[in-house]
Amino acid sequence: MGRFLAMLLCLCQLVLPVQAKEAKYVALTFDDGPSGKYTQALLDGLYDRGVNATFLLCGYRMKDYPELTQRIFDEGHEIGFHGYSHKNMKNMSRRDIAAELEQSQALLPKGCVPAFLRPPGGCCSDAVRQVAQAKNLAILGWSVDPRDWSTQDTAAIEKAVLKNVRSGDIVLLHDMSDSSVRAALDIIDALLAQNYEIVTVSRLAKLRNCRLRPGRSIAALPENS
């Protein structure tokens, strides 16, 4: 009798449906580039891992690195605006903000239509919001910031992200130093090992059925957002 019950239990376990794991998504964003060898190393690492990210590019750097700007676009990454000069937009007039975006727009690869503006430093104002709305841009914030620009300690950068990241987060990183790039690639490896899918911000919004609103800010897109 005991043997029969054991066999029955095994059969039940075989036919019981396996509960699917909840999908986990994170968007990685990179500010201030392109930056020559560091952006190139980051793009190589993203390509090797089959991962796409969102790049918030400065116009004056796009001017200096047109080939890298084109490569970012060609390899399926998302491009957003980060101003032309990287000056604080908070106290700029609408006219000056619009001029910054128009200068950057002229340097974008053909066919690239940004969906986001991330003001330098995240500093926003009514003028920033009004210009973003007029140019059909959502304002992109973030929910995880390891302050990678302030340290060369890759382990500290990685810990600051991996300790705090949750599904739906938008992570702020930079491609301006070797330590930032090495940390970013290690973070990606760790997230992939934890079954996260790393996506662009636009892709994350689509997965969350979130309609991007011009002139409105987003900082994270958790489930049911």
Predicted segments — roles?
Residues 1-4:
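Positively charged n-region of N-terminal signal peptides that target proteins for export
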Residues 31, 46, 79, 117-120, ...:
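Divalent metal-coordination and catalytic microenvironments
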Residues 19-107, 113-114, 186, 197, ...:
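Active-site beta->alpha N-cap acidic-glycine motif
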Residues 30, 57-60, 81-83, 119-121, ...:
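A cross-domain feature marking catalytic cores of carbohydrate-active enzymes
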Residues 48-53, 62-63, 179-225:
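C-terminal domain-boundary segment and adjacent tail
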Residues 38-41, 87-112, 121-167, 180-186:
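Alpha-helical scaffold elements lining the catalytic groove of polysaccharide deacetylases
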Residues 9-14:
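Hydrophobic core
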